[in-house]
């Protein structure tokens, strides 16, 4: 029995936990709404369930979702929650009017003046106190909006306070309008830096207010939305993103118009271009350094300045890429996607096929379309040429891109530095830091483009051996390549065995597919963790800090490491891992040999036992203790048979021996 103080402490902890967290069911009861409405409200307000640590999971339960009580209490007086309750009351009035046949009252209730509507203006101001915070969420917003912009609506409705399970006509029109405004801004401001064509669609990257924004535009084709998807969740995100992008685009367009007006005024007055369409100084990305600022702040400002200068160089190379060129896009090519790249790089898109006004024709056919004549002064290229020029920031030779020619590989600029410039290398390093599993392999096509940009360029690793080693054995996952041997499985090797393990055989060895078993203690720990649902529990804070410090130390050592030292380190790691693999193979072979010996010895011992049994039976037959039955197929114990006959003569029954219990070796609960 627990002490009074211990019981009181447990009670206080439990009450404190109840005050701090609420379950989803408690939150819906507090707000007096259904779970669907509660989930939609949380999406709009940016409230998500909290991950609890192990001690709190034990006293609360594993299958429940918990929210901070203070965040749920904020929703009690929220205007969106009040509008949802008002809409529920309005629905009851409409049903009553329909049931009673009051057409005039029904007409008044369904008018836009009476029907409740909610506004997300205050919510957007709460979630994004600074404009740069909203810019950082534009990538997810534009990917979602572009997805629904080409989907056909299924419900005719202009309001979003209802819970729709399919795309409405009002949201579809707003999504198309936002996409057009965003493409227009990117083309006017000329902030597009990269592009890539993939199976999923068209990837773009733009630098807006000092932030890299990447979004995905899907391929437009006949579609059918798959069943079984809760669309109201995605539509809730879409509703919020549409409202957010209105504010973002208004701010960007007004800043762009102001900068263009200032630039024109400066050109008219002084004849010198002072401002560009995109001014990073007005982006609010940098802070002014005071005179008494410490060294850490100075270092941060210096890093931000270098980042800003690299982005400025990147944009300067792209903005005048297609200057003076006019492209005609054939009808089989999606004109929106390629017109965005051409306009953002300073080129023009022709609407009519007039050879005197055109320099390039973009065709995605093995031959020219019917009715179009070929002219020698024009270049007829395939669509990939536009994106490859954008990524290389250079007008590439059209050889290999003409109609009917086999295209070169289309390399993603997000994982490989195509130009090998400082700004591209910095961007790729940041991507690798955010996504550690990206392999830094440089294809041969990238070396060709780098040679075109800089004739003095020479590839350090043209065959990609170092990149192959990095992809196969990374520093963070080197322990996964070879399973660690436990103490009970480890066996000391002699000198001859080590020499045999190091010797490279002339034949190809059979791969060891045997699974290495966990030790009993480790297996028991894993079992207990699974029972307590702690396999995916959050990492301890001390352990997380230690891992973060180790990771930072590894990154620092990598930055100061030369390419030769890196190659030597990778080769030594490979040799060490090969030795460990050979050691493991030898240990597995030893275990296989032990099992084979055990099997052979069992067969030999069984044969010996059988021979001894037969010899004993022959001896007993010779002594008369056993004799054959009448049919000659069995043996009978002479003494036992005599006792049975005497008992039968006295009309008694001989007590038979109990049969052996086959479950004798099993535990009692099985019997």
Curated annotation (Swiss-Prot):
GO terms for cellular component: nucleoplasm; PeBoW complex; preribosome, large subunit precursor. Signal peptide: none annotated. Keywords: Coiled coil, Nucleus, Ribosome biogenesis, rRNA processing. GO terms for molecular function: ribonucleoprotein complex binding; RNA binding. PROSITE patterns: BRCT. Residues 317-403 form the BRCT domain. Residues 548-584 form a coiled coil. Residues 552-578, 643-671 are annotated as: Disordered. It is found in: Nucleus, Nucleolus; Nucleus, Nucleoplasm. It holds the Pfam family Pescadillo_N. Its main location: nucleus. PANTHER family: PESCADILLO - RELATED, PESCADILLO HOMOLOG. Required for maturation of ribosomal RNAs and formation of the large ribosomal subunit. Belongs to the pescadillo family. This is Pescadillo homolog.
